[in-house]
């Protein structure tokens, strides 16, 4: 019996020894190379099973990166850094917001970077323009250009930036589009960063305007203003002599003013430069501000950024809070529902002396103006 137990023990020891030898001589499992680790890491960033990254992920990797061959760990980190950099906006550039309110500055902007076009007609030179030159234009003559249809020596003495458009003085869509065409061409020639159009019944708060425009890079596609409708306008686009089709788009009303970046304005060239703006306006048979919206939204696919900081006489201006006047980009005056329509502000002037309230607003924004009463209470 002892001999039998001894043989069993010997066989067990021999078997264990053979098993150890087999384990030692077998090839070890390959250690993942840095490249493989890099690919696995990139796949994990992209999501499980090669799926798309989660919406809003700032570390999302370009699918093209995943198909590249990674030859070293340093290359992997290089690709990862590049992917994160590409996913983030450039320094100082925030993602576009739709509310049209100022955001952190995207670029440094000065008054000489902005081209303000004021559309008017000869019969309103005294009734409307004199008020503008007395108030906001007096501080910003170098950046403000008057587009009119009639010569005026008195106006020429006030500023050298008077542009005779050779357009009709009628308030027709053809005449309005004619003036807008001249405005566009003069802006392109100026080389300035921003084009802003206003009417001769608008007050422009330059500080608020610069603060708003500085929120957007002028090289990007930016069309900002305030629509007068609560829905896109429906129009008929004439494709050929006998063929039309429906088209709808948003547009910023010219009565409140609007601004366009140079980057977008250059893209508008095929439909706006030279005599093209007039022919484009005829395709939809709508006025100038509608034609701008048609080119930008319907043809170029750039959405209007709607801003509540622009105001026209088509809205109830009494609802603009006095405490927020310094934030508004444009104001207006006129009639609304058969009543006098202007912002509500106490100011140093009576409603009879200052029916538009522009003088009171100007003294509120620029109390150092020589003709503003020093003891004014707002």
From Swiss-Prot:
<dbReference type="GO" id="GO:0014807">
    <property type="term" value="P:regulation of somitogenesis"/>
</dbReference>
<protein>
    <recommendedName>
        <fullName>Beta-1,3-N-acetylglucosaminyltransferase lunatic fringe</fullName>
        <ecNumber>2.4.1.222</ecNumber>
    </recommendedName>
</protein>
<feature type="glycosylation site" description="N-linked (GlcNAc...) asparagine">
    <location>
        <position position="166"/>
    </location>
</feature>
<keyword id="KW-1133">Transmembrane helix</keyword>
<keyword id="KW-0808">Transferase</keyword>
<feature type="binding site">
    <location>
        <position position="200"/>
    </location>
    <ligand>
        <name>substrate</name>
    </ligand>
</feature>
<feature type="region of interest" description="Disordered">
    <location>
        <begin position="85"/>
        <end position="108"/>
    </location>
</feature>
<comment type="function">
    <text>Glycosyltransferase that initiates the elongation of O-linked fucose residues attached to EGF-like repeats in the extracellular domain of Notch molecules. Modulates NOTCH1 activity by modifying O-fucose residues at specific EGF-like domains resulting in inhibition of NOTCH1 activation by JAG1 and enhancement of NOTCH1 activation by DLL1 via an increase in its binding to DLL1. Decreases the binding of JAG1 to NOTCH2 but not that of DLL1. Essential mediator of somite segmentation and patterning.</text>
</comment>
<feature type="disulfide bond">
    <location>
        <begin position="167"/>
        <end position="178"/>
    </location>
</feature>
<keyword id="KW-0735">Signal-anchor</keyword>
<keyword id="KW-0325">Glycoprotein</keyword>
<dbReference type="GO" id="GO:0001541">
    <property type="term" value="P:ovarian follicle development"/>
</dbReference>
<feature type="disulfide bond">
    <location>
        <begin position="196"/>
        <end position="259"/>
    </location>
</feature>
<dbReference type="GO" id="GO:0030217">
    <property type="term" value="P:T cell differentiation"/>
</dbReference>
<keyword id="KW-1015">Disulfide bond</keyword>
<dbReference type="GO" id="GO:0000139">
    <property type="term" value="C:Golgi membrane"/>
</dbReference>
<keyword id="KW-0217">Developmental protein</keyword>
<dbReference type="Pfam" id="PF02434">
    <property type="entry name" value="Fringe"/>
</dbReference>
<keyword id="KW-0479">Metal-binding</keyword>
<dbReference type="InterPro" id="IPR003378">
    <property type="entry name" value="Fringe-like_glycosylTrfase"/>
</dbReference>
<keyword id="KW-0333">Golgi apparatus</keyword>
<comment type="similarity">
    <text>Belongs to the glycosyltransferase 31 family.</text>
</comment>
<feature type="binding site">
    <location>
        <position position="201"/>
    </location>
    <ligand>
        <name>Mn(2+)</name>
    </ligand>
</feature>
<keyword id="KW-0328">Glycosyltransferase</keyword>
<dbReference type="GO" id="GO:0046872">
    <property type="term" value="F:metal ion binding"/>
</dbReference>
<dbReference type="GO" id="GO:0002315">
    <property type="term" value="P:marginal zone B cell differentiation"/>
</dbReference>
<feature type="topological domain" description="Cytoplasmic">
    <location>
        <begin position="1"/>
        <end position="8"/>
    </location>
</feature>
<feature type="transmembrane region" description="Helical; Signal-anchor for type II membrane protein">
    <location>
        <begin position="9"/>
        <end position="29"/>
    </location>
</feature>
<dbReference type="GO" id="GO:0033829">
    <property type="term" value="F:O-fucosylpeptide 3-beta-N-acetylglucosaminyltransferase activity"/>
</dbReference>
<feature type="site" description="Cleavage; by furin-like protease">
    <location>
        <begin position="85"/>
        <end position="86"/>
    </location>
</feature>
<feature type="binding site">
    <location>
        <position position="128"/>
    </location>
    <ligand>
        <name>substrate</name>
    </ligand>
</feature>
<dbReference type="GO" id="GO:0007386">
    <property type="term" value="P:compartment pattern specification"/>
</dbReference>
<dbReference type="GO" id="GO:0045747">
    <property type="term" value="P:positive regulation of Notch signaling pathway"/>
</dbReference>
<feature type="disulfide bond">
    <location>
        <begin position="363"/>
        <end position="372"/>
    </location>
</feature>
<dbReference type="InterPro" id="IPR017374">
    <property type="entry name" value="Fringe"/>
</dbReference>
<keyword id="KW-0464">Manganese</keyword>
<feature type="topological domain" description="Lumenal">
    <location>
        <begin position="30"/>
        <end position="378"/>
    </location>
</feature>
<dbReference type="GO" id="GO:1902367">
    <property type="term" value="P:negative regulation of Notch signaling pathway involved in somitogenesis"/>
</dbReference>
<feature type="binding site">
    <location>
        <position position="313"/>
    </location>
    <ligand>
        <name>Mn(2+)</name>
    </ligand>
</feature>
<keyword id="KW-0812">Transmembrane</keyword>
<dbReference type="GO" id="GO:0001756">
    <property type="term" value="P:somitogenesis"/>
</dbReference>
<keyword id="KW-0472">Membrane</keyword>
